[in-house]
Regions:
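Outer-membrane beta-barrel translocator domains and adjoining extracellular loop/strand segments
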Residues: 1, 5, 37, 45-54, ...
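Structural signature of outer-membrane beta-barrel domains
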Residues: 29-31, 40-44, 82-84, 94-98, ...
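Extracellular loop and loop/strand-boundary signature of outer-membrane beta-barrel proteins
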Residues: 1-10, 58-64, 74, 99-107, ...
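Transmembrane beta-barrel strands of outer-membrane/channel proteins
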Residues: 18, 24, 35-39, 89-95, ...
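Conserved C-terminal beta-signal and adjacent last beta-strands/turns
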Residues: 109-239
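Outer membrane beta-barrel strand-and-loop segments of large Gram-negative receptors
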Residues: 7-13, 19, 28-90, 104, ...
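Outer-membrane beta-barrel channels and translocator barrels
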Residues: 17, 27-31, 70, 80-84, ...
Length: 239
């Protein structure tokens, strides 16, 4: 697109961050709650930057802004009922202030941002493992525009057969096809708004057959060891 040009910036400086965090954990037989208060400030923060010339051509690159501060609260809670049910909920809300006065007097943002997520893992009759998870990004303001947020849910089931030698799994990402967001971008002499939507709903099916015997001395060799993959985990990890 000749009217939207992207280029690099070889003069970027590294970011330097100073942070402070206070954490607390409450643990009972079935429930664990972790809370964290945090504050951090970053100098020479790296951000995308857009300029539009008199001919209407947009130039997109990365720049250093003077400073950015983030302060807020993060909470993670996990509840278990034996080995059959696990619920994990997390969320964070924080205030962000960005100072870009090194580039323009009024460049920057000052507002709240937040996100949340959940994950439910369950063992049901017949040896089936079920997992449902979701995530939410709250609307927020950025240096040169706004982001309107989104929500998304995924689900998966799996089952072992023949004494664990065969495992079948089925996963659906973005079940309700909701992963899209609206945005605005504005600066000196330009304003743009739009909606971004990508193909996000997919169905994944897999069958794994394990055979042979893994010798003790071979465990952990190769790419991170046997079973080091992260996809489709039902042990509390993300898909």
């Amino acid at each position: 697109d000749p009217r939207n040009l992207r280029y690099g910036n070889p003069f970027l400086l590294p970011e330097y961050t100073d942070g402070l965090e206070f954490g607390h954990q409450l643990t009972t037989k079935a429930l664990t709650v972790t809370t964290s208060l945090f504050y951090k400030t970053t100098r020479d923060v790296i951000r995308r930057f857009v300029e539009v010339d008199d001919a209407g051509i947009a130039y997109r690159t990365f720049v250093n802004l003077a400073r950015q501060t983030n302060s807020g609260l993060e909470v993670v809670a996990m509840w278990r009922k034996g080995r059959s049910l696990q619920l994990r909920v997390n969320g964070s809300i924080y205030h962000q202030k960005t100072d870009g006065s090194n580039l323009a007097p009024d460049l920057g943002n000052n507002g709240f941002q937040g996100s949340a997520g959940y994950q439910v893992s369950a063992l049901v009759n017949g040896g089936w493992k079920v997992q449902i998870n979701g995530r939410y990004r709250a609307p927020s303001q950025y240096t040169q525009g706004t982001f309107q947020g989104y929500i998304s849910h995924s689900a998966a089931v799996s089952r072992d057969f023949y004494d664990g030698k065969v495992k079948g799994s089925l996963r659906v990402s973005d079940v309700f096809d909701q992963q899209e967001w609206s945005y605005t971008s504005e600066g000196r002499d330009f304003f743009q708004d739009g909606t971004f939507k990508r193909q996000s709903r997919f169905i994944y099916a897999s069958v794994t057959w394990s055979f042979g015997k893994l010798e003790p001395g071979q465990r952990g060799r190769g790419n991170g060891g046997y079973g080091s993959g992260s996809g489709g985990s039902f042990d509390g990890g993300d898909f």
